[in-house]
Amino acid sequence: AASDVYKRQIWGVIDMVPITNFPDIRSRCAVHSRESGSMMVIPRENDLCRLYIQLKEVAREDGEGSDVNAAKAKGRIDRSKITPESIIKQAKEIIQPFDLDITDISWFTGYQIGQRVATGFHRNNRVFISGDACHTHSPKAGQGMNVSMQDTYNLGFKLALVCKGLAKQDILQTYQLERKKVAHDLINFDHKFSRLFSGKPMIPNAEKLEGSKDAGGVDLDEFHQVYVQGAKFASGTISDYQDSIMVKKTGAKPRSGEEADGDFNPLANNVPVGRRLFSDLVLGHIDYKMVHLADKMPSDGRFRVLIFPGDVHQYKANWNTLNKFNDVLEAKDSFIKRYTPVNAFPSSVIEILTIHASLRFDIEFHDFPQFTRSTDFKGRTDYWRIFCGAGKAYDGTDIDIYKTFGIDKQAGAILVVRPDSHVAQVVEYSLDGLKQVDEYFSGFMLDQRNNVLPEKDKTINDAIRFLQPRLAV
């Protein structure tokens, strides 16, 4: 079941080649008219253009024989009455005083804005729905496909962990917990965007014009701000997941601001816990190649533990702590070993990345403790898990991910990042912090020490392993 949230509006959409003197026809833009409604212009491939047009008058069905109360009350729109001619007729009125004609129509349709959210996203953690089955809204801001893919991405990695026997079924309950809130946020945004898009524009100083009735129109500056915010929302970068077994916000404090909104732990003052981790440039310690951190965390179902030990060359205590981590993480009962099947690649469930703040030439690669540069069944070293987070690249580019994340180069920090790139936890860089990471995983992961995979054949050339799925293999 789904609940209607807001009043429906009627829109027409048409893909065609425009013939017009409107100067912004090849720019994505919104056109507000004083009396004739609104229109959105979206340039497409080649010379095609899509117009979303607010329709003022559309015939409705009588609703007889319908079991739907809304249809009985006022009837659904009669889609057969929405034609290219009726859509363009309205567009011409909206775009005045510019001229508009069309040719090469490739597609058109009409729709009602029905803003709804399903009452539940699953049944007994056995049947799940996502995307349009969960939430419907206007298509104008581009959020539909993006939010739907984020639904399935959120659900997908959790199903993979459960189906592979790596995690408890409890994590499936967090799908509705996390995504239903996003759906309601989506509807609230869509309602505001649709209201601003559909309303009459505010006429500056209208109250001073004799006989004017337009003083209460849409503020176009506000519309632009919502438009920009919509891009962030549609991309998923501001989806904020609340505290649960998969998100631990202990130590994080809420903060509001145009560019900083969320729950932040002072150990990583610019990293909102529960949101997607922002990426920045780092330098590979072994090869000094400049790379985005996100490119080293592909979407393959694995968790990442990002250790920021600070400047381990300048602060010897930080270096000593990093070496103490080795005894903990190399032990048979460490969270790395407990939750990775026997004979699987060492980092195939939880991958540890070390991002220090020292100059690359101050520390040799093989001086780092073993857990940071593990070897596989053939003795091959994993070179791509140690990075320099501060310094200069060969081309002179300044690198400082510590500044980007708000991490002190003496205090350091540890971040746990989920397979969907959302930050699950921020803790101090210490043995106590490492224990908190262990407790986080013990809340939902299943012990794999009795899950023995077949031994790998050392005689086979397995270079394809870099292209194959990496989760628990």
Question: Predicted regions span which residues?
Answer:
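Short, small-residue-biased leader/transition segments that mark boundaries at the very start
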Residues: 2-6
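Active-site substrate-recognition segment that forms the wall
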Residues: 10, 14, 26-69, 122-125, ...
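Conserved FAD/dinucleotide-binding core of flavoprotein oxidoreductases
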Residues: 34-113, 161-164
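Helical substrate-recognition/capping region of FAD-dependent monooxygenase/halogenase enzymes
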Residues: 69-75, 89, 93, 161-473
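A glycine-rich dinucleotide-binding beta-alpha-beta segment and adjacent secondary-structure elements
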Residues: 97-118, 370-371, 377-388
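Short FAD-binding loop at a beta-strand-to-alpha-helix junction that anchors the flavin cofactor
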Residues: 122-139
